[in-house]
Design a protein with these regions (language model features):
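Flavin (primarily FAD) cofactor-binding/catalytic cores of flavoenzymes
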Residues: 1-35, 39-277
Length: 277
């Protein structure tokens, strides 16, 4: 669809390049309920005539929800939480990764307020804006109708219902796919220990868990931003980069050139082994 002539289907990263073409389209659908999707929907809304907006905004998340910015909430991005997450069973970690979407896929509260204010302003004349905002929806398939329209096959995750949406343009604010490590680590593949989902196992020091025949030689492979499944939501967070790097260097040198604090959060994640009396 992206390469189809006459059918504007663009990724959010290219939105500004194609903005004029999108604004000229009759009906526009924004797919994606994160910050990019929200900003694009707001921009389109502000530049469409009142009562003739013809905008759909859909996303897979259960709600158009704000990003978790509270100070205690942000303690999920600390070494304390990273260590706690790593200690959990694999199936629990996987459930948490999906459940914690609001820690990194939410929307700035100011943007949500601006969208609501703009929609409300358009009701002051007694009408209702021609917009549809529906969370909890995934796009199953998509195809062209004739040469200038697009049909999206939608499924509501909670209702388990399906429908079709015909639109003139689509903006895909769906993020970027993480690149798999397989090609980079192809030479090591026979030696990499994997979890139940065939993902590389990574220890608490950010080392790939390799066959003992490799580690016995003193060889190790360290990774950063490839360990969300083992270290949690903070894996790609730049705020933890210095701590990750220091952890790796301390392990490499078998010394402690970088002194790291033993506690970094006021929250105690999990029950302590020795209860307080």
């Amino acid at each position: 669809l992206v390469d189809a002539p006459g059918v504007p289907v663009v990724h959010a990263a290219d939105y500004l390049t194609h903005r004029d073409t999108l604004l000229a389209a009759g009906h526009i659908t924004v797919v994606g309920s994160g910050q990019s999707g929200a900003e694009i929907f707001l921009d389109l809304l502000r530049h469409r005539p009142t009562g003739r907006e013809q905008l759909h905004w859909i996303g897979r998340t259960p709600a158009f929800a704000p990003m978790e910015y509270s100070k205690l909430g942000l303690e999920h991005f600390t070494p304390d939480y990273t260590r706690y997450f790593h200690s959990l069973p694999e199936n629990v970690r996987d459930r948490l990764t999906d459940a914690q979407w609001q820690l990194h896929k939410g929307i700035d509260a100011g943007t949500l307020s601006a969208i609501h204010d703009e929609l409300y302003r358009r009701t002051l004349n007694g009408d209702w804006p021609d917009t549809v905002l529906t969370p909890g929806v995934r796009v199953r398939t998509a195809g062209r109708i004739a040469t200038t329209r697009i049909e999206l096959h939608l499924e509501h995750i909670q209702q388990n219902t399906r429908t079709r949406l015909t639109t003139d343009a689509v903006v895909l604010a769906t993020g970027h796919r993480e690149r798999p490590l397989d090609r980079i680590l192809a030479g090591l593949d026979p030696y990499i220990r994997r979890d139940n989902s065939e993902r590389p196992r990574i220890d608490e020091h950010f080392r790939l868990v390799l066959d003992p025949s490799v580690t016995a030689t003193g060889c190790n492979v360290y990774v950063q931003n490839a360990e969300r499944h083992t270290h949690g939501v903070g894996a790609p967070d730049l705020g933890l980069a210095a701590w990750r790097s220091a952890t790796i260097l301390n392990t490499l040198t078998a010394d402690e050139p970088y002194h790291l604090p033993t506690r970094t959060a006021f929250t105690t994640f999990g029950l302590e082994h020795q209860p307080h009396h």
